[in-house]
From Swiss-Prot:
Residues 820-841 are annotated as: Disordered. Keywords: Cell membrane, Cell projection, Disulfide bond, Endosome, Glycoprotein, Immunity, Inflammatory response, Innate immunity, Leucine-rich repeat, Membrane, NAD, Receptor, Repeat, Signal, Transmembrane, Transmembrane helix, Ubl conjugation. Disulfide bonds join 29-40, 281-306, 390-391, 583-609, 585-628. Glycans are attached at residues 35, 73, 205, 238, 282, 309, 497, 526, 570, 575, 625. One of its GO terms (cellular component) is lipopolysaccharide receptor complex. This is Toll-like receptor 4. Residues 24-632 are extracellular. Residues 579-630 form the LRRCT domain. One of its GO terms (molecular function) is transmembrane signaling receptor activity. The TIR domain mediates interaction with NOX4. Phosphorylated on tyrosine residues by LYN after binding lipopolysaccharide. Ubiquitinated by RNF128 via 'Lys-28'-linked polyubiquitin chains, leading to proteasomal degradation. Residues 673-816 form the TIR domain.
């Protein structure tokens, strides 16, 4: 039975939530929970849709036009547990309408103008626990056929036309009834006969709500010896006299909770005399609540004398002329003062008080010390209070305090380290302004503290020992504060038992790698609304028991280059929504991980790309790996192409003149040479070339036409082009005049390198080396290739003597004639016995 109640209680709020989160079309209704819950509200239905599954447990048909409910109208839904028929203009309910609904626990008929309700209308409801018949034109409980509903716990018939409080005899068949709501009916008088059934069959757990009934009279002795769990009388009386008389009529009642007063928007009493409550001396009350009463007249010193022995007293929006009524040492254990017009904080001295709630009293700004030696629970929320030197046992007059709530107040200066308050288990400062929290380890003595909330307290955390001493802490909430350099340091060293940590809205940009190393018991971590740029899984690896991680509303683009499997194994809920994801191939691994972890990620469908622009506001799940494969291929081909072009370009640039030479060889390869030799020399040696080389070769027999740059190069053409086209291509031989100046000239070396290529490409080409002067080997070795050639090949060496000259010119002419085609006239003066060339050593 209890299981059905729990299911109904869970399904009712679930409808509102899930209808927003998981709704899908189930024409014409909305499927809230597949095969379980369906919402058919405001669809202008005249009958129940045929396509609702037989397994449905919760069905909302409110605001339709069903009008007439016939026999076995809902027999197609034997599993139904909650049925809402609010405002369906139902006028007739026949016998056995709900027959077959053996599991139905909640039935709501609110707002139906019922004209005909058959005696067997509710037959078959063997498990019904809650029946709501608000605004159903009910005029008497005698006409309501519910006597057989033995499992009924809650009956709500408020806002009807019931004139009599007489409880029918069938109430003796409702042993489980716990709540009867008769508020806002037409009940004026209550007589002994009306509650006779309660004398015969006590309903000890029954709570009655008679608010907003125009009560004029309660017969004395009506409730004598009756025990009730609760009675609510709010906005019932037109005058203080009527209220006083009716309270006196309650004499003899034993009640757990009595509520008197008015509603905020339903005020009837113009004044309140302290004598009104004198009748309470004849009642046995455990808990008393009085609400929305003001303009007390007379001295209120004895106002609560008849409530001296109650355990719980609650004052809601009560305007007391002075505080004298609260200054006596009553036996109260629980006192609530909510939104009352006090000018200053009450100086209480209640030796038995264990729980004190003093909230929403906006006119009080200063705190007054009080003496409450038994106090364990203190709630001072929303009072605009300021504290200087908070907190110690001297402030509250007790060393037994376990719960302290100072949230939503003004400035609280922590000048003490909670001396004498070592038993504290719950401490809440949220939305108050904390000062001096970084001065020292203010929580050092709170080794029993389980819950700490310093959210939105304008704290900038600098001191790393701020949480020293909190070895038993389970929950820490510190949202809305800031850290030095926007870095979360290692400040949780001693919090080894922490299970819940809230760091949201702390403007965090970085987290120290060891920040969470001590939190081996952590199960819930909220890092939302910060400025984190990446999902660093290594941070959370030590959190072996972590189940819930919220990183939403950050600036996360991707995960760091880590193994995403480092996330704790127990993690079942990860929120990464509202981040700046970069849906690019560079982060392909992370994006694929998002797709693979849809069950772990909350709202994975709502994870949107922030860049690139063509994917902005597109779902992360829409990213395709194939795009990256194509991109990789394109990039690879492009890179290879660029490399090849670059290499070719470099080679062409480096060997440009060699290529020109090659092209020229093909062009001039078969033609006659214009020159016998192209002379390569240093400008420093030009006198020797003109006076010796040119004179002896061009004027000698046979004559040899030489190609000289100063004479034969074409003006306006690049030097390199002249060297190749006029020098090498039109000459049979190349004469290289080697000297110290030659070796030091870059142009000479360049011409020499081209000459080597020319010799390689042309089969008839030849290079004749003339060493003009003795060369130092150290200088010659600077040109490795030239040194190697002179070491391995013959060359001519100039000697300025008669014999040396004769031998030099004879050998040079012979070298120039080698490979030259024979003319018809022959070469009569060609040498026939050339002397061997010398070889350098």
């Amino acid at each position: 039975m209890m299981a059905r109640v729990r299911l109904a209680a869970a399904l009712i709020p679930a409808t509102a939530i899930l209808s927003c989160l998981r709704t899908e079309s189930w024409d014409p209704c909305v499927q809230v929970v597949p095969n379980i819950s369906y919402q058919c509200m405001e669809l202008n239905l005249y009958k129940i849709p045929d396509n609702i599954p037989i397994s449905t447990k919760m069905l909302d048909l409110s605001f339709n036009y069903l009008r007439h409910l016939g026999s076995h109208n809902f027999s197609s839904f034997p599993e139904l547990q909650v049925l809402d028929l609010s405002r369906c203009e139902i006028k007739i309910i026949e016998d056995d309408t709900f027959q077959g609904l053996n599991h139905l626990s909640t039935l709501i008929l609110t707002g139906n103008p019922i004209q005909s309700l058959a005696w067997g209308a509710f037959s078959g409801l063997s498990s019904l626990q809650k029946l709501v018949a608000v605004e159903t034109n009910l005029v008497s409980l005698n006409d309501f056929p519910i006597g057989h509903l033995k499992t009924l716990k809650e009956l709500n018939v408020a806002h009807n036309f019931i004139h009599s409080f007489k409880l029918p005899e069938y109430f003796s068949n409702l042993p489980n009834l716990e709540h009867l709501d008769l508020s806002n009916n037409k009940i004026q008088n209550i007589y002994y006969e009306d509650v006779k059934v309660l004398h015969q069959m006590p309903l000890l757990n029954l709570s009655l709500d008679l608010s907003l009934n125009p009560l004029d009279f309660i017969e004395p002795g009506t409730f004598k010896e009756i025990k009730l769990n609760g009675l609510t009388l709010r906005s019932n009386f037109n005058s203080s006299h009527v209220m006083k008389t009716c309270i006196q009529g309650l004499a003899g009642l034993k009640i757990n909770r009595l509520v008197l007063g008015e509603f905020k928007n339903e005020r009837k009493l113009k004044g309140f005399d302290r004598s009104i409550l004198e009748g309470l001396c004849n009642l046995t009350i455990e808990q008393f609540r009085i609400a929305y009463l003001d303009e007390f007249s007379g001295d209120d010193t004895d106002l609560f004398n008849c409530l001296e022995n109650v355990s719980v007293i609650s004052l809601l929006s009560v305007s007391l002329g002075s505080l004298q009524a609260l200054l006596k040492d009553f036996r109260w254990q629980h006192l609530e003062i909510i939104n009352c017009d006090f000018d200053k904080f009450p100086a209480l001295k209640l030796s038995s008080l264990k729980k004190f709630v003093f909230t929403d009293n906006k006119d009080i700004s200063s705190f007054t010390e009080f003496q409450l030696p038994s106090l364990q629970y203190l709630d001072l929320r929303r009072n605009h209070l300021s504290f200087k030197g908070c907190c110690s046992h001297a402030d509250f007059g007790t060393t037994n305090l376990k719960h302290l709530d100072l949230s939503f107040n003004d400035v609280i200066t922590l000048g003490s380290n909670f001396m004498g308050l070592e038993k504290l288990e719950h401490l809440d400062f949220q939305h108050s302004t904390l000062k001096q929290i970084n001065a020292f380890s203010v929580f050092l003595s709170l080794r029993n503290l389980r819950y700490l909330d310093i959210s939105y307290t304008n704290v900038r955390i600098v001191f790393h020992g701020i949480f020293t001493g909190l070895v038993s802490l389970k929950t820490l909430k510190m949202a809305g504060n800031t850290f030095q350099d926007n870095l979360l340091p290692d400040i949780f060293t001693e919090l080894t038992n922490l299970t819940v940590l809230d760091l949201s809205k702390c403007q965090l940009e970085q987290v120290a790698q060891t920040a969470f190393h001590s939190l081996s018991s952590l199960q819930v971590l909220n890092m939302s609304h910060n400025k984190l740029l990446s999902l660093d899984t290594f941070l959370y690896e030590p959190l072996h028991l972590l189940r819930i991680l919220d990183c939403s509303f950050n600036r996360i683009m991707d995960s760091k280059e880590q193994d995403l499997q480092n996330l704790p194994r127990n993690l079942t809920w990860l929120n990464l929504t509202q981040n700046a994801f970069a849906c690019v191939c560079e982060h392909q691994r992370f994006l694929q991980w998002v797709k693979d972890q849809r069950q772990l990620l909350v709202g994975a469908e709502q994870m949107m790309c922030a860049e690139p622009l063509d994917m902005k506001d597109m779902p992360v799940l829409s990213f395709r790996n194939a795009t990256c494969q194509m991109s990789k291929m394109i990039i690879s081909v492009s890179v290879v192409t660029v490399l090849l072009v670059s290499v070719v370009g470099v080679l062409v640039y480096k060997f440009y003149f060699h290529l020109m030479l090659l092209a020229g060889c093909k062009k001039y390869g078969r033609g006659e040479s214009t020159y016998g030799a192209f002379v390569i020399y240093s400008s420093q040696d030009e006198d020797w070339v003109r006076n010796e080389l040119v004179k002896n070769l061009e004027e000698g027999v046979p004559p040899f036409q030489l190609c000289l740059h100063y004479r034969d190069f074409i003006p306006g053409v690049a030097i390199a082009a002249n060297i190749i086209q006029e020098g090498f291509h039109k000459s049979r031989k190349v004469i290289v005049v080697v000297s110290q100046h030659f070796i030091q000239s870059r142009w000479c070396i360049f011409e020499y390198e081209i000459a080597q290529t020319w010799q390689f490409l042309s089969s008839r080409a030849g290079i004749i080396f003339i060493v003009l002067q003795k060369l130092e080997k150290s200088l010659l070795r600077q040109q490795v290739e030239l040194y190697r050639l002179l070491s391995r090949n013959t060359y001519l060496e100039w000697e300025d003597s008669v014999l040396g000259r004769h031998v030099f010119w004879r050998r040079l002419r012979k070298a120039l004639l080698a490979g030259k085609p024979q003319s018809p006239e022959g070469t009569a003066d060609a040498e026939t016995n050339p002397q061997e060339a010398t070889t350098s050593t």
